[in-house]
Swiss-Prot record:
UniProt entry keywords in alphabetical sequence: ATP-binding, DNA-binding, Metal-binding, Nucleotide-binding, Repressor, Transcription, Transcription regulation, Zinc, Zinc-finger
Family stated for the protein in its record: Belongs to the NrdR family.
Lineage, highest ranks first: Bacteria, Pseudomonadati, Pseudomonadota, Gammaproteobacteria, Enterobacterales
Record-given protein name: Transcriptional repressor NrdR
Organism of provenance: Escherichia fergusonii (strain ATCC 35469 / DSM 13698 / CCUG 18766 / IAM 14443 / JCM 21226 / LMG 7866 / NBRC 102419 / NCTC 12128 / CDC 0568-73)
Matches recorded under Pfam families: ATP-cone (PF03477), Zn_ribbon_NrdR (PF22811)
Spans through the membrane: none
GO MF terms, alphabetically ordered: ATP binding; DNA binding; zinc ion binding
Listed NCBIfam families: transcriptional regulator NrdR
ZnF (unnamed) intervals: 3-34
Record note on cofactor: Binds 1 zinc ion.
Keyword Hydrolase found: no
Length: 149
C-alpha cells in the first residue's frame, strides 16, 4: 500500500485487529521511507445480485431502498436501529447465498416480510398490506389470523 504522506510504495503492517464483528480488519501501518503511521480498513467486496422487477426491468441491488422500506414499516415501533441493521445484513447474506447473479424482487419482499415478522408483528402487517396490495379489512384480518397460528 502506498504511503498517504510521501507516496512511497513500501509500508509495513504494525498491528491488525478484527472490527465490526469480524467483518473487517483494521491495520496500523508504518511507511518504511518517512516512518509516518496510518490506519487502513479492509473489508471483503461482496457483490450483490441484480434485482429483476416484476416488469422484467433489471436494476442494481439498492440497500437504501431496502432500508427505507423497512423503516417505513417500522415507523414509531419499538425496534432498535441495531436490530434493523442486523435484519438488513441477514437479508443481504441470504441474497448472496443464493449464488445467483439476479434475484426476483419478489424474493427480496418475502425476505423482508420474514425479518419483519421476527422484529415486530405490526410492522410486518404494515409491510404486507402494501406489498401484497390488501384491498379490504378482511385481508388484514386473514393475515393477522395467520400470525396468531
Amino acid at each position: 500500500m502506498h504511503c498517504p504522506f510521501c507516496f512511497a510504495v513500501d509500508t509495513k503492517v504494525i498491528d491488525s485487529r478484527l472490527v465490526g464483528e469480524g467483518s473487517s480488519v483494521r491495520r496500523r501501518r508504518q511507511c518504511l521511507v518517512c516512518n509516518e503511521r496510518f490506519t487502513t480498513f479492509e473489508v471483503a467486496e461482496l457483490v450483490m445480485p441484480r434485482v429483476v422487477k416484476s416488469n422484467d426491468v433489471r436494476e442494481p441491488f439498492n440497500e437504501e431502498k431496502l432500508r427505507s422500506g423497512m423503516l417505513r414499516a417500522l415507523e414509531k415501533r419499538p425496534v432498535s436501529s441495531d436490530d434493523v441493521e442486523m435484519a438488513i445484513s441477514h437479508i443481504k447474506s441470504q441474497l448472496r447465498a443464493t449464488g445467483e447473479r439476479e434475484v426476483p424482487s419478489k424474493m427480496i419482499g418475502n425476505l423482508v416480510m420474514e425479518q419483519l415478522k421476527k422484529l415486530d408483528k405490526v410492522a410486518y402487517i404494515r409491510f404486507a398490506s402494501v406489498y401484497r396490495s390488501f384491498e379490504d379489512i378482511k385481508e388484514f384480518g386473514e393475515e393477522i389470523a395467520r400470525l396468531e397460528d
